[in-house]
């Protein structure tokens, strides 16, 4: 068996959630491979709308295995709120959601660092969501991160060391902050996380494939926000392209099957960065109004413009897209 990958071909917000909603019934497993709570997938199930930040979209299908892979960064406080809201609406997930031990944790100080770094940039701001994504991936790459699996071993010591490092940086930036409420909610989230099944996602997914199970890998954001292939430095901090499914889940490249590339009939972008086809007139405003172009997580108004076929061709190339799906053509 091979894994299929679903991803965005523009700057995110292409309508991936709706496509996932249609595709998930044919898969046994749905796995998130990158990103964090900075992006939301909007889905409709049984007449009710949901916005998922970290939890895979297969959670609404009662018989699916859902996996949060090692490439994801997880905020325990936001995860707890998201999971409890799902459970309250009749979607239990403790038995059906598996979390990679290798996924990195977003600490309260990561969120404060995110705000401090953005403030220090002045006019050169990237326009982050302030969820601590960048600082968390920075710690991951510099080998200073705290992972989900660390919750089970010497957690207090590892957390204290990371927190102390961050506080030194914040001191050097002369950034004022209050950690009390953030840390309280975060520690409650850590206790909540302990109820879930922690796995080595690379082994789990490959074993499921050996057993003949079908797997859909779910990406967040879009190709033009990829840390390597996007409009750097106005990008996210993870690999949003198809190859990210390999590194974010532990799947070999020759295991990739179909690659679903999602794009809109026009383009949108949130935050700063180049946008060649952007519209600054009433046409752009009308597209935004008719398309309800506001961020699912941030609520920020999206910049709107004509479809960029040059950028779309590039995204198809770097992802090896096998199936193109156009959204909002109506």
Where are the predicted features?
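Non-transmembrane, aqueous-exposed alpha-helical and coiled segments at domain scale
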Residues: 1-330
């Amino acid at each position: 068996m091979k894994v299929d990958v679903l991803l965005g071909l523009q700057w995110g917000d292409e309508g991936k959630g709706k496509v996932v909603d249609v595709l998930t019934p044919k898969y046994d497993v749905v796995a998130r491979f990158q990103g964090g709570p900075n992006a939301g997938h909007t889905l409709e199930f049984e007449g009710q709308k949901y916005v998922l930040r970290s939890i895979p979209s297969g959670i609404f299908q009662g018989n699916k295995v859902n996996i949060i892979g090692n490439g994801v960064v997880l905020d325990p406080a936001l995860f707890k709120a998201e999971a409890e809201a799902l459970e309250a609406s009749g979607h239990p997930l403790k038995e059906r959601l598996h979390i990679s031990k290798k996924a990195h944790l977003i600490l309260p100080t990561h969120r404060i660092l995110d705000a401090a770094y953005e403030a220090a940039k002045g006019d050169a701001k990237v326009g982050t969501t302030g969820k601590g994504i960048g600082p968390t991936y920075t710690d991951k790459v510099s080998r200073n991160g705290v992972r989900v699996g660390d919750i089970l071993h010497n957690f207090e010591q590892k957390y204290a060391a990371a927190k102390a490092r961050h506080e030194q940086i914040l001191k050097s930036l002369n950034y004022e902050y209050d950690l009390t409420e953030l840390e309280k909610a975060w520690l409650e989230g850590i206790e909540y996380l302990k109820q879930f099944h922690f796995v080595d996602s690379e082994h789990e997914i490959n074993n499921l494939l050996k057993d003949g199970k079908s797997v859909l890998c779910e990406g967040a954001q879009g190709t033009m926000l990829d840390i390597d292939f996007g409009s750097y430095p106005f990008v996210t901090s993870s690999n949003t392209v198809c190859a990210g499914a390999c590194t974010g889940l532990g799947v070999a490249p020759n295991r990739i099957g179909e690659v679903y590339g999602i794009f809109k009939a026009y383009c949108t972008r949130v935050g700063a960065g180049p946008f060649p086809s952007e519209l600054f007139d009433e046409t752009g405003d009308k597209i935004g109004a008719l398309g309800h172009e506001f961020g699912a997580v941030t609520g920020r108004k999206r910049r709107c413009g004509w479809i960029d076929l040059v950028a779309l061709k590039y995204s198809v190339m770097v992802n090896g897209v096998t199936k193109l799906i156009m959204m909002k053509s109506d």
